Amino acid sequence: MMKIIRAKLHGIRVTNADLNYHGSITLDPEQCEMAGIYPMEFVDIWNKNSAARISTYVIFGEPGSRCCVLNGAAARTCQKGDELIIAASADISGPEKLYDIKPRILTFLPDNHVDQVLYYDVFQSEKRPYDFRIVDADKHTIESCHTWPNVDITKLRSDLAAKGWSEAEIDSFIASHFSL
């Protein structure tokens, strides 16, 4: 058996920690549904701020809340605002099954709004039998993927305006450097 990634919430921020709750991680069910993460499913959690790595199970919070609450002992591994990677896994019988699986990956803005919906794609290329790419699920292109979740576009716009840039110049700059 081979353990693989099945779904991932990448860059979601901790909104709260509740030491006295029974345990688990509380997540927005709408976001979990988008990624394919289920209630009571065990997930691995990696804290990008502290490097803590834990495993716990998912419970659902309020739909649309964008919550990410570590409960019980897991609450000791994070601070409000920490950026997490939450990964659900699956077991497959062998590498040939990799061609059939398209793990969904959600990336997040600092306020826990979903930024992008991506999927991982294993394919056979001219160079190797198991090649890899990240694909934008909406556009079905690899070019659209970006890795700038910590950029505050509103603040960037404000800073450029304070330097005397016109709205047209700001729009052109944003369009040239960020694929929204």
UniProtKB/Swiss-Prot annotation:
It comes from the Bacteria. Substrate binds at residues 56, 72-74. Is synthesized initially as an inactive proenzyme, which is activated by self-cleavage at a specific serine bond to produce a beta-subunit with a hydroxyl group at its C-terminus and an alpha-subunit with a pyruvoyl group at its N-terminus. Its cofactor is pyruvate. It is an enzyme of class 4 (lyase). The active site is at 24 (schiff-base intermediate with substrate), 57 (proton donor). Its EC number is 4.1.1.11. It is found in: Cytoplasm. SUPFAM superfamilies: ADC-like. GO terms for cellular component: cytosol. GO terms for biological process: alanine biosynthetic process; pantothenate biosynthetic process. It catalyses: L-aspartate + H(+) = beta-alanine + CO2. InterPro entries: Asp_de-COase-like_dom_sf, Asp_decarbox. One of its GO terms (molecular function) is aspartate 1-decarboxylase activity. Catalyzes the pyruvoyl-dependent decarboxylation of aspartate to produce beta-alanine. This is Aspartate 1-decarboxylase. It comes from Paramagnetospirillum magneticum (strain ATCC 700264 / AMB-1). The lineage of its organism: Bacteria, Pseudomonadati, Pseudomonadota, Alphaproteobacteria, Rhodospirillales.
